[in-house]
Amino acid sequence: MQKVYTDVAQVQLIECISPKRNRWAVRWDVREEGENVTSYMEEIIDHAPTVEDVRQIITAWIDEKTATEIREGLKYQGHLVWLSMENQVNYQRDYSRAVATAGASLPVTVKLGTDETPVLVTFTTLEQITAFYEAVATHISSTQAAGWEYKAAIDWENYVTA
């Protein structure tokens, strides 16, 4: 799977690129990048794709793109929040404990930023940890919703081959 840039205005979503070898290009995420530049994602496969083949390729790409955006796309107070599954569980646990104890479990310190430039942030009040956790939860929810909307907007009929 690769991103391709071209000066071709009309991109064929499915194209037999080598009839002898039965090689096909499946293309999606077609975007105009600027004047006379179009980009798209492309996967080369060794058979004429069915709509189900195309659906699997594209939805797997959307799922991975969504997971990456969840993991790497949030900044809090200007610093990256690395939302690995482990960190998501830890943040939820710390927030739930703080709420359940009416703040008695605070302070809680989290590491933001990167491994090269870590930033430690300490939450000392329920309001602070709530603001952080709401930012995390909102980011995850809105990113998931964007992935679902992207999938829902795809017209799979455009991928029916003759």
Task: Kindly label every feature range from the protein language model.
Residues 2-162:
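A preference for well-ordered globular domain cores
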